[in-house]
Amino acid sequence: MKKTLFALLTGLFICLGITQVAHADDYLRIGMEAAYAPFNWTQEDDSNGAVKIDGTNQYANGYDVQIAKKVAEDLGKKPLIVKTSWNGLIPALTSGKIDMIIAGMSPTAERKKEVAFSNSYYTSEPVMLVRRDGNYANATSLDDFKDAKVTSQQGVYLYSLISQLKGAKQETAMGDFAQMRQALESGVIDAYVSERPEALTAESANSKFKMIQFKKGFEVG
């Protein structure tokens, strides 16, 4: 069965496409982390158009969820979010557990062997998130992170960008952005590489955080 991956390519573009539905019922099952605000997150009720997360009493919301609802409607289906870890998304799709993915993912040649990518719906850029009272709060360039302990999410292109930070210490990649925020606040890391929407969300939610955006930033692709 042909699968189409709905991929949110963070930093470059977000992809969308239509898939053959793997399940012969009333639901369109969409895989996502539900942990990458403002695109997708987990909440405790169905307020503001949230969609039920399969197998739980929780709900997912965000830009990706709203798009998923529209796609499901166009296909005559009801949306059902399947909360899935990052590394489990493609296996869930290829095994038929889900019908599509909406998640931050680069369309690499290796991934294209298993899934198909659609056109984008959003363009973003990589930035840094630091502590407002930390040693790197006044950074203005990629060269200002000497000795900084920096990480990003496991399996995403953002982690590979750390090598462009001159003198930075590349820490072990982390599972999700909630984990990185906690590590940053506690001082385990000095910064992490993110995308502008996520960093803005983190900065707005926690006054201890500061987003660093560069005039001459990371080279991507």
Regions found by a protein language model. Name each.
Residues 25-104, 113:
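Extracytoplasmic small-molecule ligand-binding "clamshell" domains
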Residues 29, 127-129, 221:
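Residues embedded in well-ordered beta-strands
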